[in-house]
């Protein structure tokens, strides 16, 4: 397999074939909380992708010099440093979105996807493949966030990225926003529906009956 094909596989596989949320069931809490708007879902996707990619790269660079007994602490320190950078950048340039994301930016530190890729992949792989793996898993996480955020904002408020898409009754249109879509349970059901769709498309992901 060529280098280009390997890169494509590393980036695309976590989207449908091995999605961190849909198949591995990781990072679900933040997916429920930050998807009321497409804007916050998109920014969270960028933040997690940035942290996962650079933490993978950094851990891989020094993996042969990390004592096994403190490897988790070292990984956490690297991830926490990157999250602090992301948090400060958001507060400086996207303050309103930073307020909407609230504590969930800081909680990237404990996101199982970020920690999982650092431990399972970066500790055993070269820096560049680790970087690509981080990007792929960040995009896989973002695929679910953006899909859920799209439907929640569209049907919950009739808007996308804050701009009116469906003519609202309050403005003389025909669409009455469904407030239920803006509540956390709706995200839970949408994620479940998305998992169902993915497993129809990818039947090999269905667990075997015991």
Swiss-Prot record:
It comes from the Bacteria. Its EC number is 7.2.1.1. It catalyses: a ubiquinone + n Na(+)(in) + NADH + H(+) = a ubiquinol + n Na(+)(out) + NAD(+). NQR complex catalyzes the reduction of ubiquinone-1 to ubiquinol by two successive reactions, coupled with the transport of Na(+) ions from the cytoplasm to the periplasm. NqrA to NqrE are probably involved in the second step, the conversion of ubisemiquinone to ubiquinol. NCBIfam families: nqrD, PRK09292.1, PRK12405.1. GO terms for cellular component: plasma membrane. Pfam families: Rnf-Nqr. The lineage of its organism: Bacteria, Pseudomonadati, Pseudomonadota, Gammaproteobacteria, Vibrionales. GO terms for biological process: sodium ion transport. It is a multi-pass membrane protein. Its main location: membrane. Belongs to the NqrDE/RnfAE family. The chain crosses the membrane at residues 42-62, 72-92, 103-123, 131-151, 178-198. This is Na(+)-translocating NADH-quinone reductase subunit D.
């Amino acid at each position: 397999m060529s280098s280009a094909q390997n890169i494509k596989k590393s980036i695309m596989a976590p989207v449908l074939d091995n999605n961190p949320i849909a198949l591995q069931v990781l990072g679900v809490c933040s997916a429920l909380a930050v998807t009321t708007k497409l804007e916050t879902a998109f920014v969270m996707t960028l933040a997690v992708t940035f942290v996962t990619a650079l933490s993978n790269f950094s851990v891989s660079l020094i993996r042969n010099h990390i004592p096994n007994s403190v490897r988790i602490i070292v990984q956490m320190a690297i991830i926490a440093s990157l999250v602090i950078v992301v948090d400060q950048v958001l507060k400086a340039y996207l303050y309103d979105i930073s307020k909407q994301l609230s504590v969930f930016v800081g909680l990237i530190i404990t996101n199982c996807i970020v920690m999982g890729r650092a431990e399972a992949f970066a500790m055993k792989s070269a820096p560049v493949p680790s970087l690509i793996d981080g990007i792929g898993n960040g995009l896989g996480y973002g695929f679910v966030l953006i899909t859920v955020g799209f439907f929640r904002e569209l049907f919950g408020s009739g808007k996308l990225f804050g701009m009116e898409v469906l003519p609202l009754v309050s403005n003389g249109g025909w669409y009455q926003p469904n407030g239920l879509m803006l509540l956390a349970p709706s995200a839970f059901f949408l994620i479940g529906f998305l998992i169902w769709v993915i497993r129809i498309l990818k039947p090999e992901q269905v667990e075997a009956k015991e």
